[in-house]
């Protein structure tokens, strides 16, 4: 309901204006307090890169985090990732993921990143606690925080913001009147803006998601031969239509298209009963939640972010200069 108001012209949104004003006052005051030192955030001894957004919903942050980890690893860095672990309930916090960690414990994005990148990943409601654990481990020399642009209690050195190039900022209003967590003017203070699909704006870095060969959810086996005939598709992500459009662009004939909310806790009986016939395609993020009960004809589509070399050059330059990008000066966290 709200999402339809955010991304379409609707006079009904003005009914939410008082709540948006209240949100603006509270969030703006908090941001101002950290920026001017009235509230102190935790500053790590290691460089911290935040990958986030100013709007709610799926903008493509996780592929950017994976890309960043892989690029830094290839250049000799030892990155670690911290996350809030949304949707999970760990046995304790901070919680470092291991090979047996589940999405019920750590959330879906952290499990995906840990399995895909093989780097240390720690979750905690207070990201500073996760950062301290990584510092104490001595295993990392740079920290990437998955989401957390608005988590000003953790100081950062570089800020990357991912924008949905197709939907942009909707009606450009703050929550709940619109989809924005912070005003569009916040982008003036970040180090880089990444445009996921669509036409990038001035100064934005274009990003493209490149699909790989589908893999079986149950055991990661690559698809040996193209799937023929109709297939079903499910997506429990921030913007499911983007995934369905990707599948159609790859030539798949979709029968059922089932969209769930982001971080949806899948029920085995429901999915097995609903998708027991035709082959099923899902996102990698959904696959990490379904692996334990997946059927043999369930597949996920791995995607990787493709970004210009100039973005990496910019980041490496900032790190070489001590990791003090614009983001380090705009807020204590």
Curated annotation (Swiss-Prot):
Broadest EC class assigned to this enzyme: transferase
An MF annotation (GO) of this entry: tetraacyldisaccharide 4'-kinase activity
One GO biological process term: lipopolysaccharide core region biosynthetic process
Residues engaged in binding ATP: 55-62
One GO CC term on file: plasma membrane
InterPro entries, A to Z: LpxK, P-loop_NTPase
Pathway info: Glycolipid biosynthesis; lipid IV(A) biosynthesis; lipid IV(A) from (3R)-3-hydroxytetradecanoyl-[acyl-carrier-protein] and UDP-N-acetyl-alpha-D-glucosamine: step 6/6
EC number, as in UniProt: 2.7.1.130
Annotated keywords: ATP-binding, Kinase, Lipid A biosynthesis, Lipid biosynthesis, Lipid metabolism, Nucleotide-binding, Transferase
Catalytic activity entry: a lipid A disaccharide + ATP = a lipid IVA + ADP + H(+)
Protein family according to the UniProt entry: Belongs to the LpxK family.
Function summary: Transfers the gamma-phosphate of ATP to the 4'-position of a tetraacyldisaccharide 1-phosphate intermediate (termed DS-1-P) to form tetraacyldisaccharide 1,4'-bis-phosphate (lipid IVA).
Protein name: Tetraacyldisaccharide 4'-kinase
The species this protein was found in: Aeromonas hydrophila subsp. hydrophila (strain ATCC 7966 / DSM 30187 / BCRC 13018 / CCUG 14551 / JCM 1027 / KCTC 2358 / NCIMB 9240 / NCTC 8049)
High-level lineage: Bacteria, Pseudomonadati, Pseudomonadota, Gammaproteobacteria, Aeromonadales
